[in-house]
Amino acid sequence: MFDNIKEFFRTIFKSRLLVAATVMVLLFSVLIFRMFQLQIIKGAEYQDNYTLKIVRERTLNSTRGNILDRNGEVLAYNELAYSITIEDNGSYDSTKEKNKLLNAEIADIITALEKNGDDIINNFKITVNDNGNYEFTVSGSSLKRFLADVFGQASYSDLKYDKKLGYNQAEATADQVMDYLKVTRFGISEDYAENMAYKITVVRYAMSENSYQKYIATTIASDVSEESVAYVSENTSKLQGVEVIDDTIRKYNDAEYFASIIGYTGKISTEEYESLSADNDNYTLNDVVGKAGIEQVMDASLQGTKGYEKLYVDYLGKAVEVLEREEPSAGNDVYLSIDKNLQIAAYDLLEQEIAGIVYSNIESSGSEMNIPITDVYFALVNNNVIDIEHFSDEKATENEKAVMHIFSGRQQTVLSSVTSELEGASPAAFGSLGEEDQDYFTYIINQLKEKKILLQKSIDKTDEVYQEWQSGTISAQEYLNHAIAQNWIDITQFTIDEKYSDSTEIYDALCDYIMDDIATDTGFSKIIYLYLIKAGSVSGKQLCLILYDQGVLAYDAEEISSLESNAVSPVSFLKDKIRNIEITPAQLALDPCSGSCVITDVKTGELLALVSYPGYDNNRLANTVDADYFASLNTDLSKPLYNYATQERTAPGSTFKMVSSVAGLATGVITPTTQIMDKGVYENISNHPRCWALNHGYTHGLINVSEALRDSCNYFFYDVGYRLATNNFSTSYDDATGISKIQEYASLLGLDETTGVEIEENDPQIADEYPVMAAIGQSNNNYATIQLGRYVSAIANDGNVYEYTLLSKVCDSDGNTLETYEPKVRNTVDVLDTTQWNAIHTGMRMVVEKLSTFNDFPIEVAGKTGTAQQSPNRPNHALFVGYAPYSDPEISIATRIAFGYTSHNAAEYAKNVFSYYFGVQDAEELLNGQAENVGESSNSFND
């Protein structure tokens, strides 16, 4: 047996398998030992070493520079805040898995943010309107760029018909874009509520804009609460690519006063990125840039220089060690020429003046264009001071519910009436309808045009049926049926089934669309409210109480009780609120509701104030755009986003007469002593224009140029225009000759081009026809207030026309001056001698001496009033230009109150500004927050 065992082992040791087996055992042992060493003994160390091999470089944003006034008062600055960013750095097996996980993560973040009172950043170009429908927030080239980006094309011209989608990408509606993004690109499940799906789309689209740039995180929320910071920190292990970062947000002091100058910041758009990165490759699609005003113009200087850091990150993308870091450098500080205190005072005084005009014309028997109280009531609804959508909210008050009940009943009646007119056998001709029904159908047709269902470009204006519609002799039913027959209707814009094959069925589908649309359309509802208010079905008392219900007015138990008990009438109540500017002219958006003022240092040409009323709160547009607020600004009838000082142009009225004086004196057609007899009616031209004084039963008699300015004598300046057109009666009358002379001297006074101010400014328009009418500021003269400001400043300083600037200097973050700015003399008006200049100055001084508002005013002021009519159905524009002190001018002023009734109101406002500037009256007395006691409210021409 022993021999057998011995033989067995001898056989094994002689076998080749033994060698192989031994080698296998040894190798396996080494492998086991190595795995034990890797995973157990040095597992953590090797894991760290592996993790640290992932190196990334990221940009460190610089701190934006401040914007300050001429005296160093801070107007725009930065405030430290926390932001939340997300970067798609996960690993996925499929696009489907990526969408599912990423969408779920974003939904969780949104839910947590909203629970903590925070919101996502929403710069998406589609919003949800008041009717719950998707709509674009941009138009024109911005919309084209957005559509190209959505469908992944380099330009709008590359968009084409997509068979799979079933529509032309270039003509995609907001609904189609949303469906494409949600379903096709981002795979957002139908399980999400519509509102959540929209918000996920907003975030995913923002992330997609950075997708081509490696390691660029997308900021999805800024200035978040401590609770949201804690949420991210506590859930860091499951929030892939999500971080809380130290950030800054842009803040603006005294926002409404300076927003029209400073503008605001926001996330860079694709168009802005393409433009800015062409000159500076440091820009990224996650940058914050200036979007308007000085913020935009001086963006490169305010931006500063970015830094960077190289760091190791772990598998979750979290930084674990910084390898290299270069600190960013702060942006430069920009100083404006504007005086903060003067700007604020001029704005508040302007609001007080406009409020006074509105107050004095409500139910005024002395006003030629009084404001009916029902117009005031409706203004609360029409300009969204009162939110009519809240009437149907579950939290609506009893007052709101009562009004909603009245509205609902009337709405059903109106909709039935509209249906009858559209579908009935005997529709009425438009002209035979009552005013209310005409308003409804006018709105319906206009909406069809606006939504490009009724194609304006396709309409044949010579078509007989179209002309009958225009004259009101056919019904809307006949007109729309004819429009379908003529292919003026785009049926692809509204839902139509295959069963709608002929024109009758298409018309039925169009009617269904119209009725569905107006049933929820806010604009249509407002027309219903208008007539309910006019009829007294919705009372002023109800609307006044709703102002308290909705928090428009601060709760006041005593005033509410007085309204409820009829101790105070709604008319008195509202007038009191307007007088105290608790309800502002801008909120009502009645005539007048806007104005502007430009104040210049006449010796240096520096702009000291550039006021546009109303303003807006640019804090709500910077950083994270308040979408609801931005939408409200765009629909606000007082147009707060419009700069009335630099963009609004109207006829200058009689403020232009100094141009005609310069032209007449410089060409020699008049001298300072030339006298012209005012005969009332100017007979030398065919339209026989009249001097305004004749309407009051008198003429100005024999007067010279100074007296003509004093009296604002139209006849005198008609004759100056005629003399310019006839070379002082030496040749026959020639329009071109006369107008070229007026253009020459208007240009010499700076009225031929923009002033040079850095922000948006519309081009001036010197009249190019009818020199006789142009000489009094009519014809087609049109100027912005800032252009009149430069012009009157040149008059005040005897001919120096300045190139304006809003800037004073730029300093680095340490206060070192890098660049200075000062107005440059564009040209000098050297065509008049001292005697001629004095004749103009004397006339302007006499203008002010004649104005009752300047009685006993201790500062000598020179100026010129102007009244311009834009529409016979609306009040006149009120203008005033002037300077002070008369003997040694320091500042000039140009002001316009659009639809301000009479130039007396503009002059009164200018006096108050001079009073503030020169300290004539205590600032607290002037700026008392009360509507100005307007002494003149007639809508007449006295200049």
Set out the residue ranges of the language-model regions:
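Active-site SXXK
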Residues: 34, 72, 106-108, 232, ...
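Conserved catalytic neighborhood of penicillin-recognizing serine enzymes
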Residues: 332-333, 376, 380-430, 641-643, ...
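Short active-site loop at a secondary-structure junction
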Residues: 332-338, 589-595, 628-656, 672-679, ...
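Mid-domain, small-residue-enriched loop/turn segments at the edges of structured enzyme/sensor domains
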Residues: 594, 689-695, 729-772
